[in-house]
Amino acid sequence: MVAAATQPSETGTLNSVSAGATRMAGFSARLDADPEQLWLGVVGTLIAVLVAGVVFAREVVYDRFIWQYFWGPVAADGNGAQCAVIRNGDVSYLFSTAECAAAERAGEIVAYPGYTLVSEVGYVLVLLLALIGVYFLLRRLDIGDSRSLFYALFPFMLFGGALRTVEDAGIAALAAGSEPLIGFPVSALIISPFIYVTVFAMTLAAVGVGVALERRGVVDAYEYPVAAIGTLLVAGSVGYLTSLAVTTTYVSLRPQVLAVVVIGATLSAAATWLLIERFAPAINAGTGLMGLVLLWGHSIDGVANVVGLDWMPALGAGPNLVP
């Protein structure tokens, strides 16, 4: 199936890659510098500035920037706390909103689970640098110019959601007085936003394995082992969660929620894609069914949020979730 998916209408994909390479070459010529070296220089400079800031201005750079907006929120989430606070050089976890508010009034450095404008801007910059790095990597490996890689990576999209639920199960285990599979601080690797880095690294490793197997003649196409690794990771995560639902009281299986989310997302994605195909086919011309897959992925996210926040009681699945 992966091989067949590479055949129809790849011209748009190839043209996009070629256009990107042309623009990059022009940019490099204007700066009279190798673009990969330029990228490494930017990344290295940013890291050096942060390290220097931590060493020479720890409270400002680490406590009030890195910790408060990036690490602290993850630490609070990983411990099931309402917030995390730096007190006299040590980190404390508070489990009531009143305590968190009192800590803020006292002028202490407080970090809440979730995102802030500062952290979101930081993550956007990291994402942009990462995308540029991925482009250079694909170009160096001479891969990624066909649709087959896109479909091979699809299981990793599902794996990301399943792995994040493993962390949720760990929080539920802590609340029930049980030991989670992955305890803090290791669990930080599967808490947003660090989970994106974790899944990216695992995906990158899978691609590396696939490319190595292809170039050694073990497989005909690197996409096959990539898809197989992703599928095994999804199956392992879902299997673990299912076993918890069967053997513990703090994790429950809600098949009606899964059914509504999958059916609702599939119908909305299909309807949207068909409407685009009917009234604005130029949008789908370069992507084909890849656009449908992308729409379905976003629809899963959207429908799951609506169901979790508003429809849980109606489905007999317990109270609505709290964001």
Residues covered by each model-derived region:
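Charge-biased, low-complexity intrinsically disordered regions
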Residues: 2-323
